[in-house]
Swiss-Prot record:
GO process terms (BP): chromatin remodeling; DNA repair; kinetochore assembly; regulation of transcription by RNA polymerase II
A GO molecular function held by the record: ATP binding
One Pfam family it belongs to: Actin
Annotated InterPro entries: Actin (IPR004000), Actin_CS (IPR004001), ATPase_NBD (IPR043129)
Protein name per UniProt: Actin-related protein 4
Binding partners and assembly: Component of the NuA4 histone acetyltransferase complex, of the INO80 chromatin remodeling complex, and of the SWR1 chromatin remodeling complex.
Family classification: Belongs to the actin family. ARP4 subfamily.
GO cellular component: Ino80 complex; NuA4 histone acetyltransferase complex; SWI/SNF complex; Swr1 complex
Region named Disordered: 262-282, 321-360
Keyword Transcription regulation listed: yes
């Protein structure tokens, strides 16, 4: 692999920057300027009890006795730094052949990172990997660059979280952003509750199945497990709960692929579910044991818009109420110019004189409508006309159509326009692709924070002045 020399790292087009997009479920790594990441890997790792070795990539799916699966990130924030460093080092060395002192790195980050986390992130990549330059880019900003829309509203439906972020002039308005946990993991918990706790079906990962005979629920499954001493049977305690849950998550992921958001009709300013036949909503889903079960694909998908609609049998799987309002404290908050600027006292008095009813839970359309209603009126029309929908959960059938209808009904004074990439591979990699576009711009060389600047001014000043 050709690498850029130190003198060309900040000279424009010749740099060979690395782009890292760490997500809760998947991590993406590649070269700036490429269309897609070179590495797309799980954000989990495996580790055998009493063994320091960490296992990454597809190898984590190999069953082992006393073997746990652990997350590296939660809500797109690193929670296991040792594992993160080891995983990134593995892919930097083995697949990308990175030469840290000769290459800069752009790292995407969610909008809700705290200052202490960002400090550790910068210090880790300068000290442990010795990159020549670093830039931290907000994920919504990267998505906006991928779409070529400097002013937009980025709606990201991810695994651990759902977020709505206004982006103005390529900069995220943190105080106007919203986030809930009603994303892919929330849907997985509903599916788990439906299959295991409500229907009491037998869950066996596919790697344990030797043969099976098709059956239909409520008839019991007919299958034979592999007779292999290296693969413990269901009654064995050798397979850890975390490993089994990780394998079951793949079943839930396949389940989510057949979900569909039900249509809605507008009636007197409200939305009501249209009458659908059981044939429309019901689908057969085959489990690894060969047992097929009829599922209502509308009911679970509806929880994206109304998180209260599904009633959990197992309360431990339910999520606490979340209205999406978050408190983000980062220095140098960007404030776009307004047509008429009020002073702080007038704004405070205005907010106090208009009390708002308390809302405990918000679905996706409510999050977006609430964000639009709270944004400056001069920005509202532009953002409503440039709503970018991204993330794996957004691929659920009919989601964007339903979202457009609800937003149009809830915001009659605005022209709603959704932008969702038709290519599913491109949509789930949208933040990385945007980072690739951003880091490959000839004018971006002045944005890199060098190792020399880091040593000279320190991480605190870098965060305050260079990264927004």
């Amino acid at each position: 692999m050709a690498t850029a020399s130190t003198t060309t790292v900040y000279g424009g087009d010749e740099i060979n920057a690395i782009v890292l997009d760490p997500g809760s479920y998947t991590t993406r790594i590649g070269y700036a300027g490429d269309d897609f990441p070179k590495v797309i890997t799980s954000s989990y790792y495996g580790q055998v009890k009493n063994d320091k070795k960490k296992i990454f990539g597809e190898s984590i799916n190999v069953p082992r006795a006393n073997y746990d699966i652990k997350p590296i990130l939660k809500e797109s924030i690193i929670v296991d730094w040792d594992a993160a460093i080891e995983q990134y080092q593995y892919y930097f060395d083995q697949q990308l052949k990175v030469v840290g002192p000769e290459q800069p790195i752009l790292i995407t980050e969610p909008i809700w990172t705290e200052t202490s986390y960002r400090q550790q992130l910068v210090e880790t990549f300068f000290e442990n990997f010795e990159f020549s330059g670093i830039y931290l880019a907000k994920s919504p900003t990267c998505v906006s660059f991928q779409q070529g829309r400097s002013n937009c509203l980025v709606v990201d439906l991810g695994h651990d979280s759902v977020s709505v972020t206004p982006v103005i002039d390529g900069i995220c308005l943190l105080k106007s952003s919203m986030k809930t946990n009603y994303g892919g993991k929330f849907l997985s918990n509903e599916i788990q509750d439906y299959l295991i706790d409500t229907k009491k079906v037998v869950m066996e990962p596919s790697f344990k199945i030797k043969s099976k005979i098709p059956t239909t629920y409520p008839d019991p499954p007919k299958y034979e497990l592999k007779n292999n001493n290296t693969i413990p049977t269901s009654s064995s305690s050798s397979l850890s709960q975390s490993f089994l849950e990780f394998q079951n998550e793949k079943i839930y992921h396949n389940f989510k692929e057949i979900l569909e958001v039900p249509e809605k009709n507008s009636s007197s300013g409200t939305t009501t579910t249209t009458t659908t036949t059981n044939k429309d909503s019901s689908r057969l889903f085959e489990l690894p044991t060969g047992q097929s079960i009829v599922i209502d694909r509308f009911k679970i998908a509806e929880s994206i818009f109304d998180p209260t609609i599904y009633k959990f049998t197992n309360s431990k799987l339910s999520f606490p109420p979340n209205n999406g309002e978050i408190s983000i404290t980062q220095a140098n908050e960007y404030r776009p110019l307004k047509r008429v600027r009020k002073n702080d006292d007038e704004e405070e008095d205005s907010n106090q004189s208009t009390p708002k009813p308390e809302v405990n839970i918000r679905g996706i359309s409510q999050l977006i409508s609430h964000t639009l209603s709270n944004i400056d009126i001069d920005l509202r029309a532009s953002l409503a006309n440039n709503i970018i929908v991204t993330g794996g959960v957004s691929l659920i059938s009919q989601l964007t159509e339903r979202l457009y209808l609800e937003l149009s009904n809830n915001n009659p004074g605005l022209k709603i326009r959704l932008h969702a990439v038709g290519n599913s591979t491109e949509r789930i990699n949208q933040a990385w692709i945007g980072g690739s576009v951003l880091a490959s711009l000839g004018t971006f060389h002045q944005m890199w924070v060098t190792k020399e600047e880091y040593n000279e001014v320190g991480v605190d000043r870098i965060l305050n002045q260079r990264f927004r």
